[in-house]
Amino acid sequence: AGPYAFGL
């Protein structure tokens, strides 16, 4: 998972 997976 990457930052965008957490909405960041």
Curated annotation (Swiss-Prot):
<protein>
    <recommendedName>
        <fullName>Carcinustatin-8</fullName>
    </recommendedName>
</protein>
<comment type="similarity">
    <text>Belongs to the allatostatin family.</text>
</comment>
<dbReference type="GO" id="GO:0005576">
    <property type="term" value="C:extracellular region"/>
</dbReference>
<keyword id="KW-0964">Secreted</keyword>
<feature type="modified residue" description="Leucine amide">
    <location>
        <position position="8"/>
    </location>
</feature>
<keyword id="KW-0527">Neuropeptide</keyword>
<keyword id="KW-0027">Amidation</keyword>
<dbReference type="GO" id="GO:0007218">
    <property type="term" value="P:neuropeptide signaling pathway"/>
</dbReference>
<comment type="function">
    <text>May act as a neurotransmitter or neuromodulator.</text>
</comment>
